[in-house]
Design a protein with these regions (language model features):
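A structural boundary/capping signal
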Residues: 2-265
């Protein structure tokens, strides 16, 4: 063990909370070397050290989740399911990533007998499970959090389309997400489109100048921006910092100093 880390760990037992906070700050600067050491200490019999070790681990987990989401937001065409899980974990930070992924895999398994490899069968399955699109004027964070959407079968138009697109891809059906007059739909290679908002209706494609195509990164950035807006509306400094920080990094902004006070402090 690094001597500096060893000496700092001994100081975690300090009765003075302010001193302990300074020690924690110093330890966090040595993140790459901490994991193994902290695992050994997390069940120590010393309650003060145990509490502070758990605090450090929580901070490290938050940092890593934020870094992972920032990376996904910066990719040219990000992996959509992983990105949505990472975004969910920013808003519901007490949830576990494996639990959210289980909701996704359970959803996939439930579709197997429906053979969702064409628009008709895909639409039938989504109607069967009761998947609906939330009204456009209802801006609720739950509609943009993958785990909640998979539990409630209701979500924002773009997220419902994202879920449908990823499900279809697993069955060999390649769909593109498009926006027509503000509403989202899924476009198939044969020129048909599936419209979740209209009860999973299948329709003919509009002209090329009538729609905008959205890629994975655009969808993830929009969902992150909506959650950031929800955080500002509810004055939630914690989420403003975490989600806002991830978005800022995609614009090469290391901090949120461009925001008005008090969010830039």
């Amino acid at each position: 063990m690094n001597n500096d880390i060893e000496n700092l760990l001994k100081l975690l037992d300090d009765d003075n909370q302010q001193s302990a906070n300074l020690v924690i700050a110093e330890l966090l600067k040595r993140e790459p070397e901490l994991d193994t050491v902290l695992q050994k200490l997390q069940e120590t019999e010393n309650p003060k050290i145990r509490k502070r070790v758990h605090q450090i681990q929580s901070i490290l987990t938050t940092r890593r989740r934020r870094k992972s989401l920032a990376h996904s937001l910066a990719l040219k065409n990000t992996e959509l399911v992983n990105g949505c899980v990472e975004l969910h974990m920013q808003w519901y930070d007490n949830d576990s990533e494996p639990a959210v992924m289980r909701l996704w895999t359970d959803f996939i398994k439930s579709s197997e007998k429906y053979h969702t490899d064409n628009l008709e069968r895909l639409a039938r399955f989504m109607r069967k499970v009761g998947f609906t699109v939330a009204p456009r004027d209802e801006v609720e964070p739950d509609y943009y959090c993958l785990g909640i959407v998979l539990e409630e079968f209701t979500g924002a138009d773009p997220l419902v389309c994202a879920i449908t697109k990823e499900l279809a891809a697993l069955r060999g059906l390649s769909l593109r997400i498009i926006q027509i007059m503000g509403d989202f739909a899924l476009m198939a290679p044969d020129g048909k489109m599936l419209i979740p908002k209209n009860g999973w209706k299948i329709a003919e494609m509009p002209g090329a100048d009538e729609y905008i195509e959205w890629d994975n990164t655009m969808l993830l950035k929009m969902a992150a921006s909506i959650l950031f807006l929800c955080a500002v509306n509810t004055d939630s400094f914690r989420y403003i910092h975490t989600i806002g920080g991830c978005i800022a990094k995609t614009a090469c902004k290391p901090t949120l100093e461009f925001l008005p006070y008090p969010y830039n402090s």
